[in-house]
Amino acid sequence: MTVQHPDVVIRYIKTKNKTRKLATYRSDDCDLRIKHETINKFISERFIPSVFTKGYVKNRSIYHNAAAHLYNDYYIMMDIKDFFPHICHKQLSEKLFYELNLKQEGQISRKECNDIVEMCSISSRGLPLGFVTSPLLSNIYMKEFDGVFYGKLKKLGLPNVIYTRYADDLTISFKSDSIEKMQTYEDSIVEIATALLSRYGLQLNIKKTRSYNMNISNHVRVTGVNITKQDNGSRRLTVGRSVKNDLYWEALSCVEDRDADKVSHVKGLQSFVLSIEKTGYESCYSPIMMAKVHSYGFDTLKDLIDSL
């Protein structure tokens, strides 16, 4: 789609370091969105996602992305630079054709794949941020990469090596008790990722490459979820104290001001916290903080939020 469709609305979102181009729909029931949702349904019924991807897949989330690495020692996190805008349409169309005909031939033709890619794009390269089809198509684009990359990691002989991808975030972890070898391992992994990504017209954002050693620190953050080491050596997943503090204060503000949007945000935030920590997240609050909750007639913060 090289000419802007009348159902597409372009917005620009400013972040700390850049301005992102966002393609949204004129309305939730416009023709283009309905077509995109039909395409998503057709593809989802025929596509088997990579076992390594934890993003944009049913019953997988940032929780599963972090949990996969829970008991490893050394972590390397890498980021694909400008991932969605650099996806190659020709390669995507070929991969779409291969994946949709994998279980049963004749599901879709090459021309139909080309048409889908064009209909789900707004330029000659890349997938637009904001289209409902972009996440699924990006996983099709990266499925081959995921398998090949993991195979190359296995050949390095790293103990218990684990690889996951959440959209453009790559996480590699393994066990090791040799600090001297860490930099060599990291250099090799970055070199492999760089060379392999280039085949797909992609590159690493080297500035965002990070590594952590749990034998030195007691926590590491993986796609927004903290893996923390307990005093007894066990590990657990947490969202971090700042998120739980935000939940507490925003929930209390909703008791007096029951603004529907604020209440919805608080309930969504609590759902996120519970999805990661499951139970016991309120143990971080001081007796004074919990006394405030009790003063409203509730035993727990969860009870207070559920009542909003």
Where do the language-model regions lie?
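Short beta-strand-to-loop capping motifs
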Residues: 172-177
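Short beta-strand
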Residues: 161-166
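Right-hand nucleic-acid polymerase module
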Residues: 1-131, 136, 140-154, 179-308
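Active-site-adjacent structural elements in folded domains
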Residues: 156-158
